[in-house]
Amino acid sequence: SAQMALFKAMEAPCIVYGETAGTIQGDRTAPLSTKLKLDAAQTRAYGHKLTVFAEWCAGQGMPLSYHHHMAAPIETEAELDVLMANSGAALPLLFDAGHMAFAGGDVLRVIDKHHARINHVHTKDIRGHVIARLDRSKASFLDAVIAGAFTVPGDGTLDFEAIVKRLASYG
């Protein structure tokens, strides 16, 4: 396809895939607590579809990288664990420290569990005090962003020295 040719021509290291169907990421009227939740059967089917797509992308010479994300079906550490268990090794992972921490996950534990699948990293930090005061039954993802939930590494609460060292320890 023309899009795949463009990625290759630009020498992109991978295609980042972030789910947008049925998500509330761009809806300022949708509280964080209303995000789409997949049941076990839906997660199995989703994992299978993502694996097939990742295999196709790899066959085109362009690896995929799945991006877990706030306000999307795969947001939390537990949801990511279930997706990784229900998808094939052909589906690589984009590890996003900021989104995982925002979702309440243990970023170092996620790296330890899924390091073999990580092929791309986003290094955004979080402001823990902003996230802690959010009322997830009222605040949307965009409200959180506007309030300053995310920031650059070193300006927030995550220990990026530990994160980078942990990633580097796996190669």
Give residue ranges: language-model regions:
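Short amphipathic alpha-helices and their capping/turn segments at secondary-structure boundaries
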Residues: 2-13, 106-119, 161-169
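Short, small-residue-rich loop/turn micro-motifs
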Residues: 19-21, 125, 171
